[in-house]
């Protein structure tokens, strides 16, 4: 996608129009591109990536603080950690099509860098840093509302939360207990896929069950279900 097309895309999809377009170019520029174009002014994305990391931390913390007024500090911290996992940033770079605007060197382009998670993680933070410098926190929040924050009501961030450790910590708060996970059922699905059902019990009393495409995922789902039951009591 050309830079003009990418700027038009940002405007039509997110209502984002940079006042200082140099910031946008910097956020999308890899070092190898500048090495191959020494006559072009400007920097690569790395300084903006540094800034964007901090902007993400603050934006996510504020979002969670306001959205979940009854959550304690531990719950807020755990969810914040899950939401600012750099592994998730690569996903949201693709969702927002930031990968299509990156300025790459020819060698990096040929090696598939445009779809490389590590680069997309960096570009996400650099874009956030550039948007913050250009338009402030409110513009960043609006962009996140359409991308990262929109995923909060799905199970996307569950992959980054250790529900088994959370359950163990909660159950053993007042002393040692015996926590046992069992595989209760296994189904063979189409295309060689499998579905597992697992249970979690405490001192031989079953708390909850969960399903997943692997035993590990099923146990994690069971732990999550158990936590939900305990938190509702």
Swiss-Prot record:
InterPro entries reported for this sequence: dsRBD_dom, RNase_III, RNase_III_dom, RNase_III_sf
Gene Ontology molecular functions: double-stranded RNA binding; metal ion binding; ribonuclease III activity; rRNA binding
Domain RNase III: 7-136
UniProt keyword tRNA processing present: yes
Active site (UniProt): 53, 125
Keyword Translocase carried by entry: no
E.C. designation(s): 3.1.26.3
SMART domains the UniProt entry points to: DSRM, RIBOc
Organism domain of life: Bacteria
GO cellular component, one term: cytoplasm
Residues reported to bind Mg(2+): 49, 122, 125
Signal peptide: none
Catalysed reaction equations from the record: Endonucleolytic cleavage to 5'-phosphomonoester
Cofactor: Mg(2+)
Keywords (A to Z) from UniProt: Cytoplasm, Endonuclease, Hydrolase, Magnesium, Metal-binding, mRNA processing, Nuclease, RNA-binding, rRNA processing, rRNA-binding, tRNA processing
One GO-annotated biological process of the protein: rRNA processing
DRBM domain residues: 162-232
Localization terms from the record: Cytoplasm
PROSITE patterns assigned to the protein according to its UniProt record, in alphabetical order: DS_RBD, RNASE_3_1, RNASE_3_2
CDD domains recorded: DSRM_RNAse_III_family (cd10845), RIBOc (cd00593)
HAMAP family: RNase_III
Subunit structure: Homodimer.
Job of this protein: Digests double-stranded RNA. Involved in the processing of primary rRNA transcript to yield the immediate precursors to the large and small rRNAs (23S and 16S). Processes some mRNAs, and tRNAs when they are encoded in the rRNA operon. Processes pre-crRNA and tracrRNA of type II CRISPR loci if present in the organism.
NCBIfam families from the UniProt entry: RNaseIII
Protein name: Ribonuclease 3
């Amino acid at each position: 996608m050309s830079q003009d097309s990418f700027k038009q895309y940002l405007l039509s999809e997110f209502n984002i129009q940079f006042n200082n377009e140099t910031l946008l170019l910097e956020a999308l520029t890899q070092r190898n591109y500048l090495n191959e174009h020494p006559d072009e002014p400007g920097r690569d994305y790395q300084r903006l990536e540094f800034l964007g990391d901090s902007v993400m931390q603050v934006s996510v913390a504020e979002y969670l603080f306001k959205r979940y007024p009854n959550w304690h500090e531990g719950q807020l911290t755990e969810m914040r950690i899950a939401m600012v996992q750099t592994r998730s940033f690569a996903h949201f770079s693709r969702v927002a099509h930031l990968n299509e605007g990156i300025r790459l060197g020819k060698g990096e382009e040929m090696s598939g860098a445009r779809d490389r998670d590590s680069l997309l993680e960096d570009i996400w933070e650099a874009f956030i840093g550039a948007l913050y410098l250009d338009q402030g926190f409110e513009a960043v929040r609006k962009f996140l509302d359409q991308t990262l924050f929109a995923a909060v009501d799905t199970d996307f961030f569950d992959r980054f939360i250790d529900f088994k450790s959370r359950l163990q910590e909660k159950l053993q708060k007042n002393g040692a207990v015996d926590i046992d996970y069992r595989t209760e059922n296994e189904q063979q699905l189409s295309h060689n896929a499998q579905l597992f059902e697992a249970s979690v019990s405490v001192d031989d009393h079953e708390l909850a069950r969960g399903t997943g495409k692997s035993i590990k995922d099923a146990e994690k789902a069971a732990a999550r279900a158990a936590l939900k039951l305990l938190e509702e009591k």
